[in-house]
């Protein structure tokens, strides 16, 4: 199974890349973590937020492989504990499909794109900056894998 994070935004601080790479390297090949950065629509284009989200949605669609299971990150999504995320990861793995986590830009994700997803996931009730979302998601996916495989990383 491959875990793909399709995230709008291309110029992240160095600490984000360092943290992302660290968690991605920790995961084994049968649960590989891959980042697909999506070019954001310029906020100076004169387009409405809905038009910008639609343009970003088209770029996200293009970046995803066919047949991937889509999970949108959204503030109104399911709030899972880490253990519940681990159980969900196990179900996704048993289903035999790659999983893509979609992270929107400053205005969020296009409504039609969210509707095409098989689930909505909320990382926190707090508003998080986009660089932090990448790191937090990578860490939680690694932690979920650690729980699933009885790796000692997670101590609860």
Swiss-Prot record:
Superkingdom, natural source: Bacteria
Classification via Pfam families: SPOUT_MTase
Top enzyme category: transferase
GO molecular function, one term: rRNA (pseudouridine-N3-)-methyltransferase activity
Compartments (UniProt record): Cytoplasm
Endoplasmic reticulum found in the keyword field: no
Binding-site residues, S-adenosyl-L-methionine: 73, 104, 123-128
Primary location recorded for the protein, binned into one broad class: cytoplasm
The EC number(s) this enzyme carries: 2.1.1.177
InterPro entries attached to this UniProt entry: Alpha/beta_knot_MTases (IPR029028), RlmH-like (IPR003742), tRNA_m1G_MTases_N (IPR029026)
Reactions that this protein is recorded to catalyse: pseudouridine(1915) in 23S rRNA + S-adenosyl-L-methionine = N(3)-methylpseudouridine(1915) in 23S rRNA + S-adenosyl-L-homocysteine + H(+)
Keywords: Cytoplasm, Methyltransferase, rRNA processing, S-adenosyl-L-methionine, Transferase
Gene3D superfamilies, sorted: 3.40.1280.10
A GO term from the CC aspect: cytoplasm
HAMAP family registered for this protein in UniProt: 23SrRNA_methyltr_H
Subunit structure: Homodimer.
Family indicated by similarity: Belongs to the RNA methyltransferase RlmH family.
Function: Specifically methylates the pseudouridine at position 1915 (m3Psi1915) in 23S rRNA.
Name assigned to this protein: Ribosomal RNA large subunit methyltransferase H
Lineage start: Bacteria, Pseudomonadati, Pseudomonadota, Betaproteobacteria, Burkholderiales
Gene name per UniProt: rlmH
């Amino acid at each position: 199974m491959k875990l793909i994070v399709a995230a709008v935004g291309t110029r992240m601080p160095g600490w984000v890349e360092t943290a992302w790479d660290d968690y991605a390297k920790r995961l084994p090949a049968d649960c590989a973590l891959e980042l697909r950065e999506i070019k954001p629509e310029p906020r100076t284009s004169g387009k409405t937020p809905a038009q910008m989200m639609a343009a970003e949605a088209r770029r996200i669609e293009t970046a995803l492989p066919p047949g991937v299971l889509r999970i949108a990150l959204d503030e109104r999504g399911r709030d899972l504990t880490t253990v519940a995320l681990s159980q969900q990861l196990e179900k996704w793995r048993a289903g035999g499909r790659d999983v893509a986590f979609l992270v929107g830009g400053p205005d969020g994700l296009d409504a039609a794109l969210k509707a095409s997803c098989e689930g909505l996931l909320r990382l926190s009730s707090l508003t998080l900056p986009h660089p932090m979302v990448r790191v937090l998601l990578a860490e939680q996916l690694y932690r979920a894998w650690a729980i699933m495989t009885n790796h000692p990383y997670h101590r609860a």
